[in-house]
Amino acid sequence: MKSILNDFLLMIQFFTRIPVNKNLQCEKENFRRGAFFLPVVAFIIGGMEFLIYLALKNFLPPNVIIVLLILFTAMITGGLHMDGLADTCDGFFSLRDKERIIEIMKDSRIGSYGTIALIIDLLLKYQLLYSLVLKGYSIAIVLAPIIGRISILFLCLSKRTAKKNGSGNIFIGNMSKPIIFFITTIVLALSTYFLGLRATIIPFIGVLLITYLLYLLCLNKINGLTGDTLGACNELGEITFLLILLMI
C-alpha cells in the first residue's frame, strides 16, 4: 500500500504543480508502476476543470469559462505538455540534422515555430471545447486530458530514445503493456458510458493513428523519442480526440 501511494504521489509531483512535499522513491520501477496513475492524474485535472465549469456556467458565458479552464490547466500542469509541443515544433521544423534538432529542443527559448504551434494549440482547444459544450458534450472537458495521457503511454511502448539522458527516458520503453491495456479498457468503458460506443471508438482510433504518425516522424527526425515529444503527443492526442468527437 505504501509503495502504491508513493507511485501515485510521484506522478502528481512529476506532472503537476500540486504541492506534495514528500521525499518519494524515484527509481525507474516507481515510474514504471506509476504509469498506471498517469490517467488518474489526468482525471483529477479534468475533474477539477469540470467542477469549475459547473460552478461558473450559471454566471459566465461558455466561451469565457473555456478560456479560464485552459488557463487553469496551464497553471496546474506548469504548461509541461505545451512546452513539449513548442520545443518539438521548433526542432522538427528547423530542418537541421539530428544533433542540431535536439539542441534546439533543449533550448529554453521559444522560437517562431514553437510560438505558432502554441497559438494554434490554444485556439483549437478553445474552439473545440466551446463547440462541444454547446453541443452537450461537456464531459469532453474531463475525457480529453485522460485520452491525451493514454496516447503518451502507447507512445512509450517504444524503446527508441533519441538521447542517452533525459527526463523522457524514465518512461520511454519502461511501460508495462498489461497496465496500459488495463487502464485503457477502463477509460474506454467510462467514455462509452458517457458518449456511446461510436463516439468513443472512432476518436480513440484517430488518437492512436496520430500517435503512430508522430512516432514515425520522431524516428525520421531524431531516431527516437524525448520528453518533449511525449508532451507533444499529449497535446496532439487531446486535439485529435476533441476534433473527431465534434465531427461525428
Curated annotation (Swiss-Prot):
Membrane topology classification: Multi-pass membrane protein
Superkingdom to which the source organism belongs: Bacteria
Keywords, in A-Z order: Cell membrane, Cobalamin biosynthesis, Magnesium, Membrane, Transferase, Transmembrane, Transmembrane helix
EC category name: transferase
The keyword Cell membrane is annotated on this UniProt entry: yes
GO cellular component, one term: plasma membrane
E.C. code: 2.7.8.26
Catalytic activity: alpha-ribazole + adenosylcob(III)inamide-GDP = adenosylcob(III)alamin + GMP + H(+); alpha-ribazole 5'-phosphate + adenosylcob(III)inamide-GDP = adenosylcob(III)alamin 5'-phosphate + GMP + H(+)
Listed pathway(s): Cofactor biosynthesis; adenosylcobalamin biosynthesis; adenosylcobalamin from cob(II)yrinate a,c-diamide: step 7/7
Transmembrane regions listed in the UniProt entry: 36-56, 59-79, 114-134, 137-157, 170-190, 199-219
Any GO BP annotation: cobalamin biosynthetic process
InterPro entries for this protein: CobS (IPR003805)
Keyword DNA-binding attached: no
One Gene Ontology molecular-function label: adenosylcobinamide-GDP ribazoletransferase activity
Stored Pfam families: CobS
UniProt cofactor(s): Mg(2+)
Subcellular locations according to the entry: Cell membrane
Function summary: Joins adenosylcobinamide-GDP and alpha-ribazole to generate adenosylcobalamin (Ado-cobalamin). Also synthesizes adenosylcobalamin 5'-phosphate from adenosylcobinamide-GDP and alpha-ribazole 5'-phosphate.
Protein name: Adenosylcobinamide-GDP ribazoletransferase
Gene: cobS
